[in-house]
Amino acid sequence: MSDDHGHAHDDPGTDDHHHHDRDHLGVAVLTVSSSRSLDEDPAGDQIADALESAGHGITTRDLVPDDYDKVQATVERFVDRDDTDAVVTTGGTGVTPDDVTVEAVEPLLAKELPGFGELFRRRSYEEIGTMVVATRATAGVADG
């Protein structure tokens, strides 16, 4: 049985399809919260610390309230930065009417990565159990 599934990278003469992977990324971190500030942002701090520990750089960091337009505009601004390869958001992913991060980000994605949400919920289940059903997560590629 062949592992060939019809993609160009199946040709042994083709470069590895992970050739674009990089060890060091420039990452923008956005916290979405109406009750926190950048000075008191444990989730954002934890994300930034984990990224830096993994060898990535934080290109910018910001905090915006739970507001669709502000979340979307800030993510768009981060995506447009030349020094930013990825944007990580935290907050605003619950099920209350104020939680709009997922709705604000998804229209910006050219390709969604549903496996991220699946993995996020699986790992969260280990920590919070069945409360995980009230969490939402999304990931994707902007700019195709």
Regions found by a protein language model. Give the residues of each.
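Non-catalytic beta/alpha edge segments that cap or flank active sites
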Residues: M1-G144
